[in-house]
Amino acid sequence: MAKRLMDEYQDEYEMVRVFANTGCEANETLDFVHACDVEFGFNTVWIEAVVNARGIPTGHKIVTYETAKRSGEPFEEVVEKYGIPNKGYPHCTRELKENPIHSYVRSMGWKKGEYLTAIGIRADEPRRVKRTISTQNKQIRVYPLVDMFPTDKLDVLDFWSEQTFDLQIPEHMGNCKTCFKKSDKKLQQVYQDNWHHFDIFAYLENQYGYVGKNMIKGVHSDKPRQFYRGYRSVRDLIASFDLSEPLPKDDPEAYEGCAASCEAFMGDEESPAWGAEAESD
């Protein structure tokens, strides 16, 4: 998407490409973003969240491929303030990606509601498309791979088959490695690749489980927050894995994948009434 927009619309729009690093992505993801810069000349701006005192929204700082954190530091800073994110408290996207990106854009002098946010959802993912304008930040989302040049997953695979490089990880390792939005199957695949990938989340649960309020099935609870569906901890999740037989490999042409559930930007409807409080500017 970014390549076609740059090639076909650069003269029509002022474009900025931003990568918000959470510190929990696979190293290969960062390598890939850097390779795109080198090969395509994207001049991507790398940023990380800057968590401020209570009452002040999350800001940003500019980093580089070389200085970007790779051991979960930005993620931990968000958890220290807002608590463990999970299905009921999905503030990780808001505080690690959405707010830092909007903070950077504002620093350029762009104002809310006066710029477009291009999102790389494909034409074969219609359920992920959100046409409404966010009431929280007046964000206007556009979907070039749906409306401007309809593109499905096979088209994307064809494009990368013609390039000299690609994202060198399987689908289950996309986004934050142990994201709670991934299916149990994909999380088991992550575990079988390297069980140490879960160390960060296990540490965060132990360290910050009691930060923030907690509700389970709509009822206030004194129990600590935990990451995974069904109110499961990292330990509970791992105990549920059936390791007796190897899982089948991902089909690269399958339309389902972990990326299908991890949104770059939240819609207003995705913020539950009992979610963590968000500061606004």
Regions found by a protein language model. Give the residues of each.
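Nucleotide-activated chemistry modules centered on ATP-dependent adenylation/adenylyltransferase
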Residues: 1-281
